[in-house]
């Protein structure tokens, strides 16, 4: 069994002001995405300036934050937020849903593309390889917060999370780290390598949706579902799996359509 590193969720306190690691992870993810996007900008569109890229990253970040929070409220704990709406603003305590953030990003990309002469999938293909940076950083934030841990296990790398998070004090799968490895590192490598060669429009987006959906669906088998939801069917189906299944099917559909519709191969290497 591995010891859980006792990390204070508050990274820095200045008087009454507290800066949480969870929030810093979002900043690291956004900064990392901007850095990679700036390195690939000329291959995407030589006419775009760094200022326009910064505008894109800003609106996508707003989509992630607003969509992620509203997605958690709607998909995972709507009754609690109806009873106490002020909880919606306590984002430092966690409670963000990737699938809601993904919808927020799609809306922001569609809106920004319309204003800047880019199609929805041109922007999504450009953005997709950057997303795992934010996903990986977010999972580290979950780990520091000692939230979203896995089921009890006797594997050598099991961890006992703090009593405030897990009163049962059982050795558990560190599922946040599994998701960091799959949704962060592995997905980044897949998309980075895949997007280095010219691909038809929608192909990179399809790869993102397919592999994120697969990775999330698999990890859900060892991750404890949110207590207020539990398992939704057959004693093992979780909300995360239900929301990931359309991504898997959608990713397959996008890849099939990208490579089978009648169009020339476009030089969209990123």
Curated annotation (Swiss-Prot):
Keywords: Cell inner membrane, Cell membrane, Membrane, Transferase, Transmembrane, Transmembrane helix. The chain crosses the membrane at residues 10-30, 56-76, 92-112, 120-140, 174-194, 202-222, 236-256. Coiled coil: none annotated. InterPro entries: Lgt. It comes from the Bacteria. The keyword Secreted does not apply. GO terms for cellular component: plasma membrane. NCBIfam families: lgt. HAMAP family: Lgt. Catalyzes the transfer of the diacylglyceryl group from phosphatidylglycerol to the sulfhydryl group of the N-terminal cysteine of a prolipoprotein, the first step in the formation of mature lipoproteins. This is Phosphatidylglycerol--prolipoprotein diacylglyceryl transferase. It comes from Pseudomonas fluorescens (strain SBW25). The lineage of its organism: Bacteria, Pseudomonadati, Pseudomonadota, Gammaproteobacteria, Pseudomonadales.
């Amino acid at each position: 069994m591995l010891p859980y590193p006792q990390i204070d969720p508050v990274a820095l306190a200045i008087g009454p002001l507290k800066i949480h690691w969870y929030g810093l992870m979002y900043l690291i993810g956004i900064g990392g995405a901007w850095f990679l996007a700036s390195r690939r900008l000329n291959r995407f569109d030589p006419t775009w300036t760094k200022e326009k890229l910064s505008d894109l990253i800003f609106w996508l970040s707003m989509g992630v934050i607003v969509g992620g929070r509203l997605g958690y409220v709607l998909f995972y704990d709507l009754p609690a937020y109806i009873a106490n709406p002020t909880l919606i603003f306590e984002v430092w305590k966690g409670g963000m849903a990737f699938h809601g953030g993904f919808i927020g990003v799609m809306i922001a990309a569609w809106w920004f593309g319309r204003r800047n002469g880019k199609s929805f999938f041109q922007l999504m293909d450009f953005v997709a390889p950057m997303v795992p940076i934010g996903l990986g950083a977010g999972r580290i934030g979950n780990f520091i917060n000692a939230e979203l841990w896995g089921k009890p296990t006797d594997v050598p790398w099991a961890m006992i999370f703090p009593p405030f998070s897990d009163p049962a004090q059982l050795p558990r799968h560190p599922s946040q780290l599994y998701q960091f490895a799959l949704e962060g590192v592995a997905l980044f490598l897949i998309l980075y390598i895949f997007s280095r060669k010219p691909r038809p429009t929608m192909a990179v987006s399809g790869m993102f949706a397919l592999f994120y959906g697969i990775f999330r669906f698999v990890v859900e088998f060892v991750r404890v579902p949110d207590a207020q939801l539990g398992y939704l069917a057959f004693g093992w189906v979780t909300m995360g799996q239900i929301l990931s299944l359309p991504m898997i099917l959608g990713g397959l559909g996008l890849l099939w359509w990208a490579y089978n519709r009648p169009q020339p191969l476009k030089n969209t290497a990123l």
